[in-house]
Amino acid sequence: MASQFQAYFKLTKFRLTSTVAFSSGMGYILAERGQVDWLNLVLFLIGGFSITVSANIINQIIERESDKLMKRTASRPLPEGIITVQQAIITSALFLIAGTVILAVYSTLNALILSLISLVIYSFIYTPLKTVSPIAVFIGAFPGAFPPMIGWIAVTGEYGWEPGVLFAIQFLWQFPHFWAIAWVLDEEYKKAGIKLLPTKDGRSKHTATIIMTYTLCLLPLGFLPYLFGMSGITSAYIALACGILFFFQTMYLWKECSVKAALLLMFGSFLYLPIVQIAFVLDKIY
């Protein structure tokens, strides 16, 4: 029973799903003009979390055969046969229904629609495209950048420049983030036929130059929340400082072209986004 529970827990990709929920929560708090309705926020996060779990399970169903080929993913519940495809489909459907109902009641229609669009793009377009072309990273960056936008729209019910700003920052951040991961796991990905690095040169200065360019473009975006009155100037400078450090890591990758440098960049990307988003929120509140 315990091992079965652990398998289902693993199926949810809890850490990944939690980061998605976190960024949507940041968007939600930034959109609130008065006192945050914490109960509604928690319920919104549960709804979004559930839909994200559903998408992650669909992803694992589709990739169950290729997951067997990689050491990092071979121990997932589906490749190991601990959970059957039928059980995974039922679990995904239950999470999807639960998330849809919760968001329908405690969110807005536009936030619900965008959440479902995100699931479709991630599960049925990005996932199979990973073995076809590196353009999968571009496609996957859309659902990857929707969470803070969904959080904002869950409060306001409307699209606009402000949620677009949150989307733009997270959208551009994903390129160095995913390419750093793809660099580290390049040999594993090749076994499974996954193509995510932006050039055919693989781990090369050409690839590192592209990663540097995208990271450089991210630097000025940190000032947009301040310019649109979403947050203060302090957080803009924090975002700039984090962006510069992030860029220095890409320079190190260009110089070394090593897995070690890519690992540092990967961990740097993990830190960049939550630090910047927390800075925006705290600067708005205080």
Swiss-Prot record:
Locations listed in the record: Cell inner membrane
Pathway: Porphyrin-containing compound metabolism; heme O biosynthesis; heme O from protoheme: step 1/1
Topology of the protein relative to the lipid bilayer: Multi-pass membrane protein
EC supergroup of this enzyme: transferase
Superkingdom, natural source: Bacteria
Pfam families registered for this protein in UniProt: UbiA (PF01040)
Keyword set includes Transmembrane helix: yes
InterPro entries on file: Protohaem_IX_farnesylTrfase, UbiA_prenyltransferase, UbiA_sf
Protein name: Protoheme IX farnesyltransferase
Species, as recorded: Cytophaga hutchinsonii (strain ATCC 33406 / DSM 1761 / CIP 103989 / NBRC 15051 / NCIMB 9469 / D465)
Lineage of the organism: Bacteria, Pseudomonadati, Bacteroidota, Cytophagia, Cytophagales
